[in-house]
Structure formats: C-alpha cells, structure tokens
Amino acid sequence: FSTLWLSGYYKTLEKTSTNYSALRRDMNTVKQNVNAQNAVIRTINNEKKKGDRSEGHFGATGFIVSPNGYVVTNYHVVKDADSVHLQNTRGESYRAEVIYIDPKNDLAMLHISDSTFKALKSVPYTFKAADSELGEDVYTIGFPRDEVVYGQGYLSSRTGYAGDTTAYQLSIPVNPGNSGGPVLDSRGQVIGIISGKQTGIDGVSFAIKTEALLRSISAIPSDSLESKLSISRKNLLSGLKRTDQIKKIQDYVYLVKVY
C-alpha cells in the first residue's frame, strides 16, 4: 500500500468562502477540513470490495511531472477517494495510487501503479520556480469534459484569492474539471496548477504557483516513492507555435477519475 504523508494543514480561510469555487466536477466549493490537524494517515488503494465503492464519481485534471508515472493534481480532488484512475487523451485508463498529499498547498502526488503503463518519453515542459510577470500570456489544458479542452488568457495578479502569495490570479475561463491542470507560459514552462475560480465573476481563476509544487516534491519521503522522481530540465516547447506545443503536451495531461 502507498502511504499518505501530511505535510501541513489545508488552507481553508479563502477556500471556504462562497466567492471561491474549487474545480473538480460535481463539487461547487471545497468543504472546510476542520479535522485536518488531526487527520489520520490514510491509504488509498484499489482493492476495496466493489460494494464499498462510493456511487458515482467525479473528475478533474492531472499532469505528468516525471515520465515514469508521477502525476500531480490538487489535494481537494483526491480527498476522501476510495480509488483513483487516470485516463489519457487516447482513452487508455490506468490505476493510480496517492503517494503524498500536501493539504496546505492543495497538492497531491499520484503514481500510476498499473502494470500496463509504459514510461513516457522525456517530459516536454519545464517548471518555472520564479514568479511570472503581470500581464504575461498563459494557457491551460484540462478536462472540464471527457475530452481535453484548451483555454488561454493572462496573469492578472501575482497573488491568488484573498491575497494568497502562493498562488496567481489568472484571466482564463475555467470550469469544474479544470482543477489540477497545468498553466504554461508562451515558452512552455509550467508556472502553476489550476485550483479554483471566483464565483460571480467571469474569467477570474486561480493557480497554485510552481514554486509551491517544487517545495512539495522536495518534501516527499524517499520511502514513499516507487522509483526516482525526476523533474524535466530540458524544455522541448520553446519557440514552437502554440498548436505544436499543445500537440506535445496533451499526452502528458490526464483525466483524473475519483471513486
């Protein structure tokens, strides 16, 4: 079984506001996790009896951070999950284990545990730790539907909801299912991860900064990793047209199905 390690307490002040909506399907707001401080280390596995599986499922987005099957998404996406499956743009589905959660930053690391999964080629994008510039052109791809959807916009604030310094505010239209999707700049660098939007105002969305993701990855205990987690250092997207960038990225972005 894969152990879930709690690295902090899920920030709920802004996330519980009626003006903030998390973006996993079938969920309008992130419920306040009042028991996070006392949360028990849990195991999410794929061996529960069929009768124990909760009825229905919801979906979100995740993307590859290491070609050997490590995928990042939001903590609120996998919270309380019995099992997790990842589906690529070709419709192939794989079992995944939640190996690490970072409730404070609303991040979760998954590992594809399915024996049919084959390691991918080099991840085409890199991860930008430094803050991006106000007004910078950005885009995301994710799964608000069962097929991948592209959205574009710009960075409208260097802080997120309620002045959160670990997040950006973006002017990108997003919908339930976009949670966990990558936010990239024109050079093909991941600058953040979609996490929510402001209700009542069209096009105002929020993304966790890549810096928080990199800190979270560094905090993963080595004994919880099935194999080495290697972040891409070579960018294969810089200088390409946007359409060509998307073609290279889409095989690394997954529909996250949570049961």
Residue ranges of model-derived segments:
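Conserved hydrophobic positions within beta-strands
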Residues: G62-I64, A96-V98, L155
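Conserved active-site neighborhood of the chymotrypsin/trypsin-like protease fold
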Residues: P67-V149, G163-A167, P176, D223-N235, ...
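Coiled-coil termination/hinge junctions
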Residues: I41-V65
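Catalytic nucleophile loop of clan PA
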Residues: V174-I194
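Short, small/polar residue-rich loop motifs at catalytic or cofactor-binding pockets
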Residues: H57-G59, D80, N175-S179
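C-terminal cap/linker of serine protease catalytic domains
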Residues: E14-T43, E47-K50, K118, I193-Y259
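Single-pass membrane-anchoring alpha-helices
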Residues: F1-K15
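Short beta->alpha transition motifs characteristic of CBS
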Residues: N74-K79, G151, S157, P176, ...
